[in-house]
């Protein structure tokens, strides 16, 4: 579980909501600190601290790209924070003290943020609201990772190339088995075949074997398996996306971003959205 800043800054929704939450939290704690503590509700302090823990937790989950695994847990935790902030805002908004009013304003902003988080994290990935929000991060990620480079395409061509050679070798063995016995009179002219020619032939054979081994080593290795949580239809405008059905098992790798490299059981290779699958190994 690696912490990568790119996971966080690559999601505009994460940046916007966490930044808004930190600003609202600073307003709330500044108002609480400037209020006379003799008449300030003690439980509001716990609500402010609890809200900070929620913001830090969400930031950490985005940094580790595990936010999708704890969405339902977050909904419960944020619902508790929503009760805290709305209760504090209701108790402070009618006060005449400027510090309490400042804290009430911060709690109102935090309540708005908590409500947005509950709707987003509690919503289905295919719901209109979630798809609208995710579209911003998906577009930016597709632009960076959606197109394969010419070198990667060239490597794929090289990995496919050795297949005809194996087919030719098989045909050569069959033709050798069917070749009739040759007498010594038919072998005239082969006495000039030198050992240098033999060494050259061996060098060419070894070179071909090394090329095949190198191509096999360059082939992508899928270290993880994931189960599809929902069915997904690939974007026809992006040739690198793959379609899959719910509960289908995929081989995945490169799981740091919002799009993972995946391979279906049919051998089809492409990219899939990380919020549609769940790691099982």
From Swiss-Prot:
GO CC annotations, alphabetized: plasma membrane
Chain intervals for the UniProt region annotation (Disordered): 164-183
Lipid bilayer topology: Multi-pass membrane protein
Coiled coil, from the record: none
Polar residues composition-biased segments: 168-183
Any one GO biological process: regulation of actin filament polymerization
Tagged with keyword Membrane: yes
Extracellular-side segments: 34-42, 95-100
Compartmental location: Cell membrane
Transmembrane segments: 13-33, 43-63, 74-94, 101-121
Role according to the record: Plasma membrane osmosensor that activates the high osmolarity glycerol (HOG) MAPK signaling pathway in response to high osmolarity.
Family recorded in the similarity comment: Belongs to the SHO1 family.
This protein's name: High osmolarity signaling protein SHO1
Organism: Meyerozyma guilliermondii (strain ATCC 6260 / CBS 566 / DSM 6381 / JCM 1539 / NBRC 10279 / NRRL Y-324)
């Amino acid at each position: 579980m690696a912490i990568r800043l790119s996971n966080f800054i690559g999601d505009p929704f994460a940046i916007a909501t966490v930044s808004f939450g930190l600003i609202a939290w600073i307003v709330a704690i500044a108002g609480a600190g400037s209020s006379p503590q003799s008449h300030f509700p003690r439980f509001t302090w716990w609500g402010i601290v609890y809200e900070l823990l929620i913001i830090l937790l969400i930031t950490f989950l985005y940094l580790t790209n595990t936010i999708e695994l704890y969405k339902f847990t977050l909904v419960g935790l944020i619902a508790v924070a929503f009760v805290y902030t709305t209760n504090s805002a209701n108790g402070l908004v009618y006060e005449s003290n400027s510090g309490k009013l400042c804290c009430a304003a911060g709690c109102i902003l935090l309540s708005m943020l908590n409500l947005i988080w509950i709707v987003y994290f509690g919503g289905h990935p295919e719901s209109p609201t979630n798809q609208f929000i995710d579209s911003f991060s998906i577009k930016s990620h597709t632009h960076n990772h959606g197109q394969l480079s010419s070198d990667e395409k060239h490597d794929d061509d090289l990995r496919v190339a050795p297949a005809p050679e194996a087919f030719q070798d098989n045909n050569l063995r069959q033709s050798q088995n069917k070749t009739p016995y040759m007498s010594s009179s038919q072998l005239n002219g082969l006495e000039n075949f030198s050992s240098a020619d033999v060494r050259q032939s061996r060098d060419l054979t070894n070179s071909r074997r090394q090329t095949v081994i190198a191509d096999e080593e360059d082939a992508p290795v899928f270290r993880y398996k994931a189960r599809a949580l929902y069915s997904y239809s690939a974007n026809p405008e992006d040739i690198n996306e793959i379609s899959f059905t719910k509960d289908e098992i995929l081989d995945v790798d490169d799981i740091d971003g919002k799009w993972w490299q995946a391979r279906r059981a049919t051998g089809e290779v492409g990219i899939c959205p990380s919020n549609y699958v769940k790691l099982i190994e």
